[in-house]
Amino acid sequence: MEDLIQRADEAGVRLEIVGGLPLWEAHPVLKHQEEVDRIRASIRKTDLGESAGCDCFHIPDVYILFPEGSLKRPDVSIFCRRPDEEEEAITLIPEAVIEVVSRGYEVKDLEIGPRFYLQQGVKDVVVFDPYTLLVLHARQEDVSRQVSPVTIELKCGCRCIV
């Protein structure tokens, strides 16, 4: 698996495996990465996060290995603590993930991703389309659509501006 991931990376594509199916997309462009950086810079603890002990530890673009074997690489993963893994895919389930839509990969980010993440136990899934300014916020109990800029309160006690 690691060899396949390395070869994909060298070829200039990001490889993910969801439910046994390989999904790929081109490496992100400047606009995409600027949005990721802007969102990450806004992530803060709320009072709930303080009382719950959530550190709002956020990491961009790392592999997450889910219990059923899928391998995803969210644009931003938010955890309540620093994951243990440093040199391999992280196995701790993120509290929240944020995806920034890449042109041509809207279906992957807006339709496949949210359903998958929620099934795996991620509590908040936020998807931002920088071309339309759509902000999709999905939870087990509901889905909302908003227009950027918007402040999102996450269940874990973190907040971000998308």
Feature-to-residue mapping (PLM):
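Gly/Pro/Ser/Thr-rich low-complexity, intrinsically disordered segments predominantly at protein N-termini
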Residues: 1-162
